[in-house]
């Protein structure tokens, strides 16, 4: 099991949502999963929240090291396909968190 969780949250305008999900699932995630030390990615859409301003989408990446998301390999894979040009510019309210497994 991975020692770290890299959590990415973001919003996307409604008119870009279908492309966002298609490109995330068919290009972005498969590309990132080729990065050494990335074990898995699971995506979620917000169902409810008790505070305002929570991003709509969340991705959980199980990773072996906290340095992986800033690595050259991650950046190169993240920039492949349509993600960097067609989706990333339309995202907002982005958060990036890394948690270390306890125990």
Located regions from the model:
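Macromolecular interaction modules
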Residues: 1-103
């Amino acid at each position: 099991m991975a020692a770290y969780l890299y959590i990415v949250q973001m919003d996307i305008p409604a008119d870009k949502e279908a492309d966002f999900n298609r490109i995330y699932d068919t290009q972005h995630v498969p590309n990132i999963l080729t990065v050494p030390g990335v074990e898995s990615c699971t995506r979620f859409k917000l169902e409810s929240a008790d505070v305002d301003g929570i991003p709509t989408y969340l991705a959980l990446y199980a990773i072996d090291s906290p340095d992986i998301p800033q690595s050259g390999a991650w950046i190169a894979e993240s920039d492949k396909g349509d993600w960097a040009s067609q989706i990333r510019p339309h995202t907002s309210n982005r958060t990036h968190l890394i948690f270390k497994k306890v125990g």
